[in-house]
């Protein structure tokens, strides 16, 4: 390929510059060309390229740089150099890391509160974080029709998805400082009248239950998208119903399904796992078909299919007759950032998933070691060549995260079972990606918020308080377990490990 040319891009300070060079070009040629385009002196240029370009000037850049690729360039342009002040001032560099992120990163966009609509805003943010669902809605073409569900009033469900698409487009494009989902809200109230309930005295719209909205939106999307949507969330159970007083009275149901797991909260529930197991193993009283008398039955559910995305609902609200409202269980119930549900599966299914889990854990260990190694590699601050502004540090981290994300996903994928169903989790492990919280004493008052994990940085989370969006530390998420009327986890969104 000697003597031929190839094209690629360099990205610097948010701008992309196309470059054409000979396949024989050296790093010195690249730096000279980049200096013309960006005004970053050659000596200050740093390239995010595997193998590096900061050594000998005679290093050939092809095939270190692939044709059509985009390479991140770091370095301060000559015109923007500012000498260090003699005395300390309050510059960006003096801010805490999370404050620097908020200065340089384009924060996600929030939703305007239209009067007791925080339940809608928090739910939409959580759904938007589910990338497969987000893409499905953004790519929705109304002319493609709806599923063959046979549901009545399919057109109104189609309209809900269309309005969700408009909202998601605004979140994605960041066209406005905040999004006003008024048309979606009106469509929801038309389809589901409970969300149009007004206060009998003030006449204003009442606060609603975010979990109820979550369920109804799932219903609408199931009607519009059918299995294409449902498979990513469908949990399948093998249910055994047994009369505790008669060993011969046993019923087994193989294919029961749901779109979420419930975490039951009793006076002894301290951890989410206990609440989930309690929800899968219950006692009920019913009439026996064999004896004709009422009897106590044990209902044991074992999971026989795990979805790509797992939704967990904390059953915090219960109907209180004395107040005629859904009151809230304030108990603290700790949830994990990584959830392993191996002990909730049928024995055969567990054996398959545990085998894959162990292989994925090896990849995760290697990934964590590489990340620790990268963090240890710091640029020498005493060298003018290696001076990095906070903006460059931020861009460096983003570039590293983006470049490595696909690589590790491919590594995980190598260990997926060949018979994996569409929308199925390859293992029995999930990572937390979002939490919808409630603040207050009952579902008809208080405030809902969403806490969403960054798609590239697992340690960075965003707090969505309607249209006010901020970055929070991972430690803040741990405090959402409850224990009072402050933010308490209500709905948790998990994504399959390695996906």
Curated annotation (Swiss-Prot):
Effect of pH on activity: Optimum pH is 8.5-9.
Gene Ontology CC terms: proteasome complex; proteasome regulatory particle
Catalysis: reaction(s): Thiol-dependent hydrolysis of ester, thioester, amide, peptide and isopeptide bonds formed by the C-terminal Gly of ubiquitin (a 76-residue protein attached to proteins as an intracellular targeting signal)
Ranges of biased composition (kind: Basic and acidic residues): 365-374
Name this protein carries in UniProt: Ubiquitin carboxyl-terminal hydrolase 6
Keyword Phosphoprotein: yes
Sequence positions bearing Phosphoserine: 470
């Amino acid at each position: 390929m000697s003597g031929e040319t190839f094209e690629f891009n360099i990205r610097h300070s948010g701008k992309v510059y196309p470059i054409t060079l000979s396949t024989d070009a050296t790093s010195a040629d690249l730096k000279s060309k980049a200096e013309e385009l960006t005004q970053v002196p050659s000596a200050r240029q740093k390239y995010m390229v595997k193998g590096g370009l900061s050594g000998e000037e005679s290093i050939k850049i092809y095939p270190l740089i692939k044709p059509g690729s985009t390479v991140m360039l770091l370095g301060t342009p000559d015109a923007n150099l500012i000498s260090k002040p003699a005395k300390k001032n309050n510059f960006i560099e003096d801010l805490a890391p999370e404050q620097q992120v908020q200065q340089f990163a384009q924060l996600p966009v929030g939703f305007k509160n239209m009067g007791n609509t925080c339940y809608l805003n928090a739910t939409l943010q959580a759904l938007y974080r589910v990338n497969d669902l987000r893409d499905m809605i953004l790519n929705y073409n109304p002319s493609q029709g709806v599923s063959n569900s046979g549901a009545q009033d399919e057109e109104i469900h189609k309209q809900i998805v269309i309005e969700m698409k408009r909202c998601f487009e605004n979140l994605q494009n960041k066209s406005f400082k905040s999004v006003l989902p008024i048309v979606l809200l009106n469509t929801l109230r038309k389809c589901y009248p409970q969300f149009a309930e007004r206060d009998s005295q003030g006449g204003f719209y009442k606060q609603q239950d975010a979990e109820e909205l979550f369920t109804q939106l799932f219903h609408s999307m199931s009607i519009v998208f059918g299995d294409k949507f449902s498979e990513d969330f469908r949990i399948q159970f093998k249910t055994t119903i047994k009369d505790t007083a008669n060993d011969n009275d046993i019923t087994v149901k193989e294919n029961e399904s749901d779109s979420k797991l419930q975490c039951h909260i009793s006076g002894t529930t301290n951890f989410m796992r206990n609440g989930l197991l309690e929800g899968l193993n219950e006692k009920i009283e019913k009439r026996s078909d064999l004896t004709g008398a009422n009897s106590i039955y044990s209902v044991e559910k074992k999971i026989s299919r795990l979805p790509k995305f797992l939704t967990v609902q904390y059953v915090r609200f219960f109907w209180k007759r004395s107040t005629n409202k859904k009151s809230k269980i304030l108990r603290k119930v700790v949830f994990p950032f990584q959830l392993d549900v191996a002990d909730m599966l049928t024995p055969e299914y567990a054996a398959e998933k545990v085998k894959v889990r162990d292989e994925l854990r090896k990849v995760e260990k290697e990934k964590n070691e590489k990340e620790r190694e990268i963090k240890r590699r710091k640029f020498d601050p005493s060298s003018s060549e290696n001076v990095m502004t906070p903006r460059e540090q931020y861009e460096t981290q983003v570039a590293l995260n983006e470049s490595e994300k696909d690589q590790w996903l491919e590594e995980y994928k190598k260990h997926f079972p060949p018979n994996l169903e569409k929308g199925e989790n390859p293992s029995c492990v999930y990572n937390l990606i979002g939490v919808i919280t409630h603040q207050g004493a009952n579902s008809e008052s208080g405030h809902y918020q969403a806490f969403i994990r960054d798609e590239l940085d697992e340690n960075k989370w965003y707090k969505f308080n309607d249209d006010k969006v901020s970055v929070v530390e991972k430690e803040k998420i741990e405090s959402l377990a409850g224990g009072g009327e402050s933010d308490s986890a209500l709905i948790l969104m998990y994504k399959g490990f390695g996906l």
